[in-house]
């Protein structure tokens, strides 16, 4: 994480007569961006800088450098946030105040005059459609921040970690480019051909650590498995935490979502999917890597629709799935008004799973749940609070965490490790880091 510079550091940097010169840029590169300055009241000031490869405004065709920051900038705006050019230089810059524990992913989007916003319609619906079409047309221009010292991830994404952001020590090797690929001897990629679901998908089966009793190893189910096996591979972080003694030897089952249509059908409260997992997939996986059938040694994890699905599985089959890791769960489902009409949230009909928990009374099968959502995903944070209150009232054990960030894989990856650790060992790594 970056060390905070004293207040006024960036103003001095930008007012320097050497601003834009090679030595000036070398200093910025050594510091890494975004630059962070200390402020009062639990906030810092972060500054993004970009070097125009074509020089100053006399030679460069660049007219905007949009900052697309998860949960911070408004990508629905007809006038999105742009960095500003320091006149007469190749320096583009923009600063803003943010929570000192914020974390988020971001891209920079340099564009030329032909890509500037069009003249938008006065009709609201048409204007929204025009804005979306225009904004999506800029996606090919998005770049990772070349001055960010961490390795870019997610293709065009960079990571920003403020000084007090929760530790993600398990991911340091990934961030600095030294992470090893998964141990081929521990990884099995198989096809699950489901008769009950009438479809086929990839499954990644991974084992960590050494156990004297393989059949007693915990089972950890990871929904949206393609994300955590390929796009943001979890393996190196799991190996690091297991080697450090923070996680026990375990069996990890990554379930591919197949595609968007299938995901939207199977993850929101679909009994058929979970029956097929229990009847078909778990026996197939256990033949390859034995694991416990104890619900207290079985964790189901997911984000967004996956967070909804993980809790649904636990609530409906607590005798098999006793531990749940839900991140940014879509507990609004199926009431889209929480997204489209959030200002009316207090009058809206709750999501079906919230209602089910509220009306179910005291549970006979208390679950152990790690639940988190981001302060900068307002609708998701609201429905997660609804669900948290319902779960506690029903007698479930819930460890709730609200982080400074958005609907962001960069935040979820840390919560995954922390959640698995708490659910499998009882340790809260963030509490330990504060002691």
UniProtKB/Swiss-Prot annotation:
Top-level lineage group: Bacteria
Disulphide bridges: none
SUPFAM superfamilies cross-referenced by the UniProt entry: alpha/beta-Hydrolases (SSF53474), E set domains (SSF81296)
Family matches, as InterPro entries: AB_hydrolase_fold (IPR029058), Enterochelin_esterase_N (IPR021764), Esterase-like (IPR000801), Ig-like_fold (IPR013783), Ig_E-set (IPR014756), Mycobacterial_A85_antigen (IPR050583)
Catalysed reactions, as listed in the record: Fe(III)-enterobactin + 3 H2O + H(+) = Fe(III)-[N-(2,3-dihydroxybenzoyl)-L-serine] + 2 N-(2,3-dihydroxybenzoyl)-L-serine; Fe(III)-enterobactin + H2O = Fe(III)-[N-(2,3-dihydroxybenzoyl)-L-serine]3 + H(+); Fe(III)-[N-(2,3-dihydroxybenzoyl)-L-serine]3 + H2O + H(+) = Fe(III)-[N-(2,3-dihydroxybenzoyl)-L-serine]2 + N-(2,3-dihydroxybenzoyl)-L-serine; Fe(III)-[N-(2,3-dihydroxybenzoyl)-L-serine]2 + H2O + H(+) = Fe(III)-[N-(2,3-dihydroxybenzoyl)-L-serine] + N-(2,3-dihydroxybenzoyl)-L-serine
Species the sequence originates in: Dickeya dadantii (strain 3937)
Family listed: Belongs to the Fes family.
Major place of residence: cytoplasm
Record-level GO cellular component terms: cytoplasm
UniProt name for this protein: Iron(III) enterobactin esterase
GO BP of this protein: chrysobactin catabolic process; iron ion transport
Presence of keyword Nucleotidyltransferase: no
Locations listed in the record: Cytoplasm
Functional description taken from the UniProt entry: Catalyzes the hydrolysis of ferric enterobactin (Fe-Ent). Is responsible for the release of iron from ferric enterobactin.
Keywords: Cytoplasm, Hydrolase
Example GO molecular function: iron ion binding
UniProt keyword Cytoplasm present: yes
Enzyme Commission code: 3.1.1.108
